[in-house]
């Protein structure tokens, strides 16, 4: 009887280990889908004047960042508060890389909680709104069992767009 219980317990543990990556990826996709729905609804519910104001504030932030001095620790912080930029819908934007089937939300910062579930925007780099002399730096994990994120980024080439 004890051997049977031990064998069953080992089987359950083995099954759990085998299913963990699949279940983790499904939960991650559900999380990203929920954020996309929320983000899209928030954008649609926000009037054009507010969206324009958010974009202009982000462009002003980028302009100040372009003129900031660089020290050993990175760019000096511009006067506008980073966390107040691009705040509609809980995500800053989305990164879309069709070649590797990636469409992920971009969150403020690169803390552990952010990078566990999504792409993080590196503080001190341009906000992802485009423009001259702007270079937004994004960060995400690759090779995680619980989420794909940037796992296939090594398949990209210099000519690929995103």
Task: Go through the PLM ranges and name each one.
Residues 4, 10-161:
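Solvent-exposed, non-transmembrane regions of membrane-associated and secreted proteins
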């Amino acid at each position: 009887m004890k051997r049977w219980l031990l064998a069953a317990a080992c089987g359950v543990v083995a099954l759990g280990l085998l299913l963990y990556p699949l279940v983790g990826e499904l939960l991650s996709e559900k999380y990203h889908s929920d954020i996309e729905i929320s983000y899209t609804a928030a954008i649609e519910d926000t009037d054009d004047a507010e969206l324009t104001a958010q974009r202009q504030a982000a462009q002003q932030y980028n302009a100040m960042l372009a003129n900031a001095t660089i020290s050993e620790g990175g760019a000096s912080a511009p006067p506008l508060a980073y966390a107040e930029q691009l705040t509609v819908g809980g995500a800053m934007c989305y990164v879309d890389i069709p070649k590797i089937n990636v469409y992920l939300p971009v969150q403020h910062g690169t803390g552990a909680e952010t990078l566990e579930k999504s792409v993080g925007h590196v503080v001190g780099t341009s906000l992802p709104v485009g423009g001259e002399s702007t270079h937004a730096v994004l960060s995400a994990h690759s090779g995680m069992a619980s989420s794909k994120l940037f796992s296939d980024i090594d398949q990209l080439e210099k000519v690929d767009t995103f």
